[in-house]
Regions:
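Accessory RNA-recognition modules of RNA-modification enzymes
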Residues: 1-179
Length: 179
């Protein structure tokens, strides 16, 4: 999740590249992070034409070249829900077939749209309504109950880089539940 599909402008083969930290419709400058015979991956490092759904990432350490786990941190909450709804519906259709997709579309919550219902968490709803200043700051964060930390060579708390065995130090984890 959290990748956009791009095509290289100057590639006669029309090669497909999966780009993290981009949004549908954006034009970005990206750095290739992985090349194989079947798939290329990249990180968007500069946004040349931004989506209206782009926001400042809630977790800079999960940005380009950083740790994994924050691939939608730069996406507005309402757009995250739309994205997740589409991914879930697509998976149900591909794996479960059209019969499952039709059953989901018939759910009262889908309201005839065929979309899978994805609702805001209470903190998100309060933030969107402007009811709670703290929730506004924390909306979309503080929900992850499990994290996998490791130790860097310097003895600092860290996490693995995206698709990497390299341990990167982390000083914040805004997605984690605070106690």
């Amino acid at each position: 999740g959290g990748h956009c599909v791009a095509r290289l402008d100057d590639d006669p083969a029309g090669r497909v590249v999966f780009v993290r930290h981009a949004l549908p419709g954006e034009v970005v400058r990206a750095v290739l992070t992985e090349k194989s015979a079947k798939i290329w991956r990249a990180d968007a490092v500069e946004v040349l034409s931004a989506s209206p759904d782009r926001v400042r990432s809630v977790w800079r350490e999960a940005g380009p070249g950083g740790v994994g786990g924050g691939e939608l941190g730069h996406v507005a909450l309402s757009a995250q829900r739309t994205w997740k709804r589409w991914v879930l519906a697509d998976c149900l259709r591909r794996i479960g077939g059209e019969e499952v997709a039709a059953a989901v579309a018939a759910l009262p919550e889908a309201a005839g749209t065929g979309a899978v219902p994805v609702e805001a968490m209470p903190s998100e709803a309060a933030a969107e309504a402007g009811d709670d200043p703290r929730a506004r700051r924390l909306a979309g964060t503080g929900t992850r109950t499990r994290i996998a930390l490791t130790i860097t060579d310097d003895g600092l708390a860290g996490m693995h880089g995206f698709r990497s065995g390299t341990v990167l130090p982390v000083t914040s984890l805004p997605l984690a539940v605070s106690t």
